[in-house]
Amino acid sequence: MITRREAVRLLGSVSAGVWFAATQSGLNLSFAANASASNYDSTPALAPGTPTSPERMALIEAFKRQSEGLQDKFEARTYKGDWVMPYRLFRPATTGKVPLVMYLHGSGGLGDDNLKQLRFGNIFGTRVWLLPENQKRFPCYVLAPQTDRGWIRYDFSQSPAKELPGFGDGARLALEIVDGLRREFAVDERRIYVTGNSMGGAGVWNMLANRPHFFAAAVTCCAGESSDDGTGSVETPVWDFHGDADQVVPVSSSRDRIAARRKAGGHPIYTEYPGVDHDGTTGLAFTEPALPKWVFAQHRS
């Protein structure tokens, strides 16, 4: 079994890891490396152990211990656009130009308290970038906006609400915040990244479709269903995660998007966790030791 010390070490470095491959429903999920100019479609090694093994759970518990108190490092701010959007911002201890990572919360973060987008399942996607070892190697701004009406467009006259095509108002306002931060701080504009979980994952796909050639890379976890088919900004590196036991967002939504993106000429990375449900995917994805190194290796030309 992995030791506590080893779990902590793995959170800040790329481990030897293991390779995971699966084939389901006719979609090849094998993660063979396919070198390219940017090397973004070469699958990094995953964390040791199976998704539900004691080794993997130790890694998640180590992350929770390490990330305690990091919420307090986020500054509370608000943006006034078509409506008021609260957001949290972490500023790194550096004066040079550094990347910016934006995290879009899932439905559990809905509201206007400027807090829930940092708590519960959102701790992984917001705090991983703040871990001391990650800030030492990859200093960056971290933006966590909060919406009370979703990232994509919905028809709320229907029950349940129906997803609509087009640029989501929540996604658009969040990008206006990014544009403002680019003017206010020394942000490396070639290295702006977007990540999201569940409803936030749908927001990521919406941004890729409606703000092409803007992001250096994207990370999605069990992304919610939407009209965005995954082919937007097809040249942008994407690492997509999903659990095949997800009862909230069917795993077929990720499989279909990834298949469409590959057909359109993209080279996304797709990691599917066997036996993992909706809530379990985010912790596994954002504690993959190779994730920070992969993200920050991507940049726009």
Protein language model regions, located:
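Gly/Ser-rich "nucleophile elbow"/oxyanion-hole loop immediately N-terminal to the catalytic nucleophile
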Residues: 156-197
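A domain-start/cap signature at the N-terminus of enzymes
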Residues: 2, 8-19, 27-100, 202, ...
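Short, proline-enriched alpha-helix->beta-strand connector loops that line the catalytic pocket
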Residues: 138, 233-238
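Primarily recognizes the serine-hydrolase "nucleophile elbow" in alpha/beta-hydrolase
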Residues: 190-233
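C-terminal catalytic histidine-bearing segment of alpha/beta-hydrolase fold enzymes
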Residues: 237, 241, 247-301
